[in-house]
């Protein structure tokens, strides 16, 4: 062995040692990353399983409530001296012509009431006659409103060649979006009617419809989601004077906004037939030139362009 090769041996040994140490460090780093990745995968898998279990549990539970219609004004909300004045003081939504006609009962306790504007329904005619519902808490705090949109209803009815298509806009206090509930024009004689709507949830629309039951004795409707699953039901009592409906929604769909839409829709069932006849008659009168159409300012506001210059 030459002197030159003997001098290279320490250098080569040091290089080999450095390479081995670098390899060990790289291997340890890879193992650590692999361990972290496995931990993350396990956490994600555990989270997905928990979400799936929660959804499965929710599908087994049902949220239910009752809507009971009163036949007189002799109730604790309206009966008594100065009751109406005090009610108007509790909420600006409680107008002078507000008539409370039903209560919401959950777990045996009244949690809310339904009212409608009597002056513009019973005491009006033509294009001035329309339905406006209000949902209040038991202490008369406003929760939601449901307005018949005559302009849209007549437009759709004329487009459906006389089949009455009633349209309602629903404003809930917890949401930034309006909900539009509309009767389907695809309605054949003796077949059940459908009312469709959608809710925005996390930027994603969720579509639903209320379909009247084929065997319908008390005003029964089934709530169906966009996958054609039955996720709720409105069951009307047969032997009742005013009207009583037991409503239920499957737990995984029991969103507060959906519950409010169902409460308002159930209250509307009482007026549904007269509302259809009213819209159909208006469409015929406008078509034949018997009346000049006009839209009330409150309804016109609902059609305003949100991007207009204010």
What are these regions (language model features)?
Residues 2-310:
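Low-complexity or membrane-interfacial segments used for flexible interactions
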């Amino acid at each position: 062995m030459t002197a030159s090769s003997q001098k290279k041996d320490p250098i080569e040994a040091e290089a080999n040692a450095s390479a081995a140490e670098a390899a060990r460090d790289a291997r340890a780093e890879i193992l650590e990353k692999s361990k972290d990745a496995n931990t993350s995968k396990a956490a994600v898998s555990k989270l997905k399983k928990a979400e799936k279990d929660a959804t499965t549990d929710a599908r087994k539970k049902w949220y239910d409530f009752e809507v009971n219609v009163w036949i007189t004004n002799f109730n604790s909300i309206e009966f008594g001296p100065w009751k109406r004045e005090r009610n108007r003081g509790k909420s600006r939504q409680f107008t002078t012509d507000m008539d409370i006609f039903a209560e919401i009962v959950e777990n045996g306790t009244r949690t809310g009431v339904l009212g409608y504007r009597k002056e513009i329904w019973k005491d009006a005619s033509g294009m001035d006659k329309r339905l406006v519902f209000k949902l209040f808490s038991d202490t008369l705090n406003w929760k939601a409103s449901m307005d018949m949109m005559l302009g849209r209803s007549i437009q759709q009815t004329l487009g459906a060649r006389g089949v009455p298509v009633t349209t309602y806009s629903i404003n809930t206090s917890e949401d930034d979006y309006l909900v539009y509930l509309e009767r389907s024009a695809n309605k054949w004689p003796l077949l059940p009617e459908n009312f469709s709507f959608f809710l925005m949830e996390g930027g994603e629309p969720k579509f639903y419809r209320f379909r009247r039951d084929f065997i319908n004795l008390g005003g029964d409707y089934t709530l169906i989601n966009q996958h054609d699953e039955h996720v709720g039901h409105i069951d009307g009592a047969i032997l009742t004077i005013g009207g009583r409906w037991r409503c239920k929604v499957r737990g995984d769909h029991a969103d507060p906004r959906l519950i409010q839409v169902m409460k308002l829709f159930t209250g509307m069932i009482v007026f549904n037939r007269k509302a259809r006849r009213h819209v159909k008659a208006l469409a015929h009168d406008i078509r034949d030139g018997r009346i000049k159409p006009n839209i009330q300012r409150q309804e016109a506001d609902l059609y305003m362009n949100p991007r207009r210059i204010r």
